[in-house]
Amino acid sequence: MKRYLSVALAALVLTGCITQPPVEPTTPPVTIEPVTPPVPETPPPVDNVPPPPKMEQSIDWAASVEPLVAQMVNSNDVANGSILLLDSVKNNTNGRLPTAKATSALHQVLSSNKKFVLISPQQLAVAKQTLGLSEEDSLGSRSKAIGLARYVSAQYVLYSDVSGDVKSPTIEMQLMQAQTGEIIWSGNGPVKR
């Protein structure tokens, strides 16, 4: 029985020694006082720099081609009422130019005089389609222009190109006979702005 008693006593002693976790002292939370942000200093006013002027001025294509057309019309080698194929103006400058506007201005100036009968843009489009050329094809070479002129039964072809520096280009025109390819008139002049 002593054994039972010693075991019971040991059990009581051991149950009384339950370990508790140590209590850590709690510190009060640190209070952070709000800080007002510093007011940013406004930078001194900046002088606005004006944008540079645009270098690209509009081109007066009609004024550029009228003197050349006047010279061509006064040529003795061309009969009144001749059929003319107007090829689109080519850009051979070192930049971009609105050559479609140049072609349109040239068409208007030529339409206003009675020396030539112009092949209509519709006839030209049909002929290009028949020959397998796209409508945007500017014919690019004199030989293509002459071949197309023969196809539409034109007597003459006006081949024009703009060359030189894009800031001060020169327009050149050549009037050629469609049957022989002979240049019967040639002229050039500055492009006017």
Swiss-Prot record:
Comp. bias regions, Pro residues: 35-54
Residue span of region Disordered: 24-55
Extent of the signal sequence: 1-16
S-diacylglycerol cysteine lipid sites: C17
Pfam families from the UniProt entry: LPAM_1 (PF08139), LpoB (PF13036)
Cited function: Regulator of peptidoglycan synthesis that is essential for the function of penicillin-binding protein 1B (PBP1b).
Family to which this protein belongs: Belongs to the LpoB family.
UniProt KW ATP-binding keyword: no
Taxonomic source organism: Yersinia enterocolitica serotype O:8 / biotype 1B (strain NCTC 13174 / 8081)
Entry-linked InterPro entries: LpoB, Membr_lipoprot_lipid_attach_CS
Protein's UniProt name: Penicillin-binding protein activator LpoB
UniProt-listed Gene3D superfamilies: ABC-type transport auxiliary lipoprotein component
Locations listed in the record: Cell outer membrane
Subunit comment: Interacts with PBP1b.
